[in-house]
């Protein structure tokens, strides 16, 4: 069921956050969220030719490295973003931990992408936009 929802979400473009377009960040928070999203998409790409049983382990290995870098950047550039990112990571890992082994990857991707979309919308709404 989760795999079917994820497939539909990917086709409809829901598995990527609004920051996927790139180039429109106006705050440090937005830039960091774009970096997190890019790392997330890159880690997803590493699973393209991996058997389903190994997707989560492959994804997690790639994503862990970039996640640590992104959190370190957030601490130094936008410390107010750290608790939000922690919540995103914790929700996604919790979903994966409670999923059946064959559904761990899909559960993580679904929860992470939706949580990232929510926090990506927050700074975008509150950012000061330059006058036209």
Curated annotation (Swiss-Prot):
UniProt signal peptide: 1-22
Keywords of this entry: Allergen, Signal
InterPro entries assigned: Poa_pIX/Phl_pVI, Pollen_allergen/Os
Record-linked CDD domains: Allergen_V_VI (cd12805)
Disulfide bonds: none
Assigned protein family: Belongs to the Poa p IX/Phl p VI allergen family.
Protein name, UniProt field: Pollen allergen Phl p 6
Organism encoding this protein: Phleum pratense (Common timothy)
GN (gene name): PHLPVI
